[in-house]
Amino acid sequence: MAYDDQNIFARILRGELPAIKVYEDDQVLAFMDIMPQADGHTLVIPKTPAETLLDLPAESAAYTIQVVQKIARAIETALDAKGIVLMQLSGAAAGQTVPHVHFHLIPSSIHELGKHGSQMGDQEKIKAAL
């Protein structure tokens, strides 16, 4: 299946839709989940157009994971998180709802993890810890 360049994350990357950005460089964007499962729930996406993890070139995947670690450390520091849930759903059958590969960083323990919330989160503490 061809990459859908009209998906919400592609539109965010092009600046067509707003996002609360936590981190951005020439290869990756990290931003707050619009319906967070916990305070500090952050999404990390490569700028490479790839629908699933398996579509992402190895070099881009490796770099994205480096940024995932950087953001996870910032979340732990900023929010005094005792743990981070890293979640990557690859493909519709796995529950992926946006057809652009992305990584969820959720400060929580698996026992506290809930469904997406109804309020937007605050990114300023995480930004300050970077």
Feature roles, as predicted:
Residues M1-L130:
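HIT superfamily nucleotide-processing domains
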